[in-house]
């Protein structure tokens, strides 16, 4: 099973069950009365981070997933069954984005962290819920609310402190294998690393997670090669190690290699080039006379950038590890300990209640070429779906809701007269007064 770190899917919470009209017939209730139960609530769609989950493969071919809908109400005041929640486990490091608004909804950075992505619809009331001193035998009931539905992307961004970037075959995999217990595939050809490799590096009773990212090539940010696909995994890193090979077989000019990688990082995201970065020259064992190192060091010195030199193959790493840990501590002191969170527009948690969402929705009225008045209003749509037009009591209640919206007054202001036709929700109505 290959790495699947991105997928798109629509999730729909369960609809609320419908209330019903029923009457009590028990022997000890001689006067009977309403007995229709309420519908059950629809199940929620819940996302939960799980450290045992490391891929989105199980969602790759899922286009639409549903939570269970609530059951309808039953006689004898029986409540409909509530729908079961749909719980989806995702890897720690998963970011959830609303594809319709491009807004980040949730960023999972802790094990067992959970988030209700879609709220289930509320169950409709049965006629027993409408009983009152002035309405002892109501012929009223409601349909359940629709569950919330969202089209989202799920994207894994690994929780690594340090990301290692560079051209293919610069020695990134060798470096992480010498620093940690990671066992990446190592060979003397390009694109040996096909997926990100994580390793834990320890120093003075502290530890950091390093990530070896597949090699970048020119125009990687525009889709060339493999590395661009995995650049998302270093968005959370506090520090980047920019590894440059001194072997002339790998690049003609190490200075040009530095600039090309920096351009690709910049084109992908300005956040990457603003991160703390250590530029490291590798394969010093090949640069026997040191001319390539001196050329690169002078070039970077003119930019005010220090250059470290190592030979990962010979484990000549100098004080690189100490420098990385010192820079990490400095970064934490500057930016705080909430290190793995991505910048979010807002951490939005939905509270789904359809009626309240539509209370302040504007009423739009337009007249067509036939003289009919077309009315659009989310709040009115909500009540047309909510109140079935099957009993006189329900029709009267719907009429009251229409008056509350103020549709009659606004139609008069627009110039509507008695006998004009109103078109709403696919139905036509005639103005009688």
Curated annotation (Swiss-Prot):
- UniProt GO BP: ribosome biogenesis
An example GO CC term for this entry is:
cytoplasm
Q: For Mg(2+), which residues are the binding ones?
A: 173, 193
The cofactor required is:
Mg(2+)
GO molecular function term, any single one: GTP binding
Write out the residues that bind GTP.
166-173, 191-195, 212-215, 282-285, 310-312
Record domain OCT: where: 355-433
Localization (cell): Cytoplasm
Could you tell me which Gene3D superfamilies the record lists for this protein?
A: GTP-binding protein OBG, C-terminal domain, GTP1/OBG domain, P-loop containing nucleotide triphosphate hydrolases
The enzyme's first-digit EC class, named in words, is hydrolase
Obg domain: residues covered: 1-159
Per UniProt, residues of the OBG-type G domain are: 160-329
> What are the UniProt keywords, alphabetically?
Cytoplasm, GTP-binding, Hydrolase, Magnesium, Metal-binding, Nucleotide-binding
Which cysteine-cysteine pairs are annotated as disulfide bonds in the entry? none
Q: Which InterPro entries does the record cross-reference, listed alphabetically? A: G_OBG (IPR031167), GTP-bd (IPR006073), GTP-bd_Obg/CgtA (IPR014100), GTP-bd_prot_GTP1/OBG_C_sf (IPR036346), GTP1-OBG_CS (IPR006074), GTP1_OBG_dom (IPR006169), GTP1_OBG_dom_sf (IPR036726), OBG_GTPase (IPR045086)
Query: What residue ranges carry the coiled-coil annotation?
Result: none
Query: What highest taxon heads this organism's lineage?
Result: Bacteria
- What is the E.C. number? 3.6.5.-
Role played: An essential GTPase which binds GTP, GDP and possibly (p)ppGpp with moderate affinity, with high nucleotide exchange rates and a fairly low GTP hydrolysis rate. Plays a role in control of the cell cycle, stress response, ribosome biogenesis and in those bacteria that undergo differentiation, in morphogenesis control.
Family statement? Belongs to the TRAFAC class OBG-HflX-like GTPase superfamily. OBG GTPase family.
Cross-referenced PANTHER family: DEVELOPMENTALLY REGULATED GTP-BINDING PROTEIN-RELATED (PTHR11702), MITOCHONDRIAL RIBOSOME-ASSOCIATED GTPASE 2 (PTHR11702:SF31)
How does this chain assemble? Monomer.
HAMAP family linked to this entry: GTPase_Obg (MF_01454)
Protein known as: GTPase Obg
């Amino acid at each position: 099973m290959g790495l699947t770190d991105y997928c798109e899917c629509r999730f729909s919470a369960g609809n609320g069950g419908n209330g019903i009209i029923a009457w009590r017939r028990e022997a000890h209730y001689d006067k009977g009365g309403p007995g229709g139960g309420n519908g059950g609530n629809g199940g929620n769609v819940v996302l939960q981070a799980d450290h045992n989950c490391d891929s989105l493969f199980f969602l790759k071919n899922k286009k639409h997933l549903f939570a269970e809908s609530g059951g309808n109400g039953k006689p004898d005041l029986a409540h409909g069954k509530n729908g079961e929640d749909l719980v989806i486990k995702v890897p720690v490091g998963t970011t959830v984005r609303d594809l319709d608004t491009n807004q980040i909804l949730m960023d999972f950075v802790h094990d067992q962290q959970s988030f209700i992505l879609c709220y289930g619809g509320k169950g409709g009331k049965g006629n027993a819920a409408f009983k009152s001193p002035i309405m002892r035998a109501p012929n009223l009931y409601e349909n359940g609310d629709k569950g919330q539905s969202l089209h989202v992307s799920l994207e894994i961004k690994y929780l690594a402190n340090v990301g290692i970037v560079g051209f293919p075959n610069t020695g990134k995999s060798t470096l992480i294998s010498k620093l940690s217990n990671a066992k990446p595939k190592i060979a003397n050809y390009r694109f040996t690393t096909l997926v990100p490799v994580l390793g834990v590096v320890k120093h003075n009773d502290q530890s950091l997670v390093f990530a070896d990212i597949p090699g970048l090539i020119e125009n990687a940010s525009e889709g060339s090669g493999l590395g661009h696909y995995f650049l998302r995994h270093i968005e959370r890193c506090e520090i980047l190690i920019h590894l440059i090979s001194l072997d002339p077989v790998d690049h003609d000019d190490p200075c040009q290699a530095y600039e090309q990688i920096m351009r690709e990082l910049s084109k992908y995201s300005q956040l990457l080039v603003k991160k703390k970065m250590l530029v490291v020259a590798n394969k010093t064992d090949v640069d026997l006379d040191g001319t390539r190192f001196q050329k690169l060091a002078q070039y970077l010195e003119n930019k005010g950038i220090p250059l470290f030199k190592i030979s990962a193959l010979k484990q000549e790493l100098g004080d690189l590890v100490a420098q990385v840990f010192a820079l990490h501590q400095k970064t934490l002191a500057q930016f705080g300990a909430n290190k793995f969170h991505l910048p979010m527009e807002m951490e939005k948690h939905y509270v789904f209640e359809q009626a309240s969402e539509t209370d302040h929705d504007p009423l739009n009225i337009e007249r067509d070429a036939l003289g009919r008045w077309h009315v659009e209003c989310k709040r009115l749509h909500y009540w047309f779906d909510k109140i079935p037009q099957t009993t006189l009591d329900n029709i009267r209640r719907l009429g009251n809701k229409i008056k509350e919206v103020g549709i009659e007054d606004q139609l008069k202001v627009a110039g509507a007269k008695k006998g004009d036709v109103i078109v709403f929700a696919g139905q036509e109505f005639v103005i009688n007064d």
